[in-house]
Amino acid sequence: ICYDSDGVGSYIDGFIRGAVPFNGGASCYPVTDPASGRLIKENYLNLKTQCYYRTGDRVQRGEMRISPDVANKMYDESQTVRQRFMFERKAIQRSKSDKDGKLRIVSKDDMKIKLGGDSPDLLDMFMMREVFELKPKTIFAYGNN
């Protein structure tokens, strides 16, 4: 389980054994360069940006999808999960690189404006699972084994 360690999500810390905190403003994780095999730091502003870009690339390559059973379930009283994903997707956009050339996405405030005051909670959750692709795996054993 990965949880948003900012705001309300910070209360999860310590309650779910093995849960991984996600701090979107943190530095991005190093990745293995396919050419050299070395760890490199990608050119993203922060972890949230790194995960959104990498998740988008993964979806475009067909490596991730939402099953039809889940996509067709109701998200709330007016939208299916698929409709909510499509609604939130319009708010997640690339932003101009900063002076250091770091890749960015638009601010959370700009996202909320595009979503009529809503936060892109569903897409944030989908994006946060990318942390398991980036972060070394930790195995938690229960009991005395």
Say what each PLM segment does.
Residues I1-K102, A141-N145:
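Mg2+-dependent endonuclease catalytic cores in nucleic-acid-processing enzymes, primarily RNase H-like
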Residues F126, P136-N145:
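C-terminal regions of RecA-like/P-loop NTPase motor modules
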Residues R17, L134-K137:
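Residues in and immediately flanking transmembrane alpha helices
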Residues S97, K102, V106-I113:
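Outer-membrane beta-barrel transmembrane strand signature
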